Amino acid sequence: MNNKIIEALIYIQGEEGLSSEQLQKVLKSESISSARALLKVFKEKWNNEQHGIKVEEFNDVYKFATIKDVKDYVSELVTIIKKQRLSNAAIEVAGIVAYKQPISKSQINKIRGVASEIVVNTLLIKGIIEEVGIAQTPGNPILYGVTAKFYDYFKIKSLHELPNLKEFDDTGEYESIEDFDLYSSQREDQDE
């Protein structure tokens, strides 16, 4: 049972990895050394089996990493993913960030009327938006802005090239968007 728990915890921790101290707290083990021993046994057992990923240890932090044999396939998938277009929701959030930056996730959620955390994380991973600061408001939320990749993706040189959009009011509603078509920049290059 411990191996299943360790596998799940390493998976959930992703790039951060799982430390002996964290495992000790989760399993309520008597000592960090006993948790470390469990991790070492898990690593050895896992790496002796046939998997596309291996367990690596970096300064007492255990992480999953791909094996060298599948490197080319992983690289190909990453290339395919990078070429994929943004979803309509991602385009919408990128537009909101461009118009309202710096802006917090909660402000984006308020404007859209739906939770946007996954979309914001996708845009962060793709490098379209980035963290630009921390608001000096309760909770100190992270503020987001667009990156140079935003300009490349939407084929614009500055935010002044975006269509005029009347300001959003405090409820997140906006008055008029007659000449606003956030999706047009993507539609234009579909015929190319």
Curated annotation (Swiss-Prot):
Functional summary from the UniProt entry: Participates in chromosomal partition during cell division. May act via the formation of a condensin-like complex containing Smc and ScpA that pull DNA away from mid-cell into both cell halves.
One of the GO biological process terms: chromosome separation
HAMAP family, per the entry: ScpB (MF_01804)
Membrane-crossing segments per the record: none
Keyword Cytoplasm (UniProt): yes
UniProt keyword list: Cell cycle, Cell division, Chromosome partition, Cytoplasm
Keyword Cytoplasm found: yes
Species for this entry: Mycoplasma mobile (strain ATCC 43663 / 163K / NCTC 11711) (Mesomycoplasma mobile)
Subcellular location: Cytoplasm
Lineage of the organism: Bacteria, Bacillati, Mycoplasmatota, Mycoplasmoidales, Metamycoplasmataceae
Subcellular location, principal: cytoplasm
Recorded superkingdom: Bacteria
GO terms for cellular component: cytoplasm
Family: Belongs to the ScpB family.
InterPro entries: ScpB_csome_segregation, WH-like_DNA-bd_sf, WH_DNA-bd_sf
Assembly and oligomerization: Homodimer. Homodimerization may be required to stabilize the binding of ScpA to the Smc head domains. Component of a cohesin-like complex composed of ScpA, ScpB and the Smc homodimer, in which ScpA and ScpB bind to the head domain of Smc. The presence of the three proteins is required for the association of the complex with DNA.
Name by which UniProt lists this protein: Segregation and condensation protein B
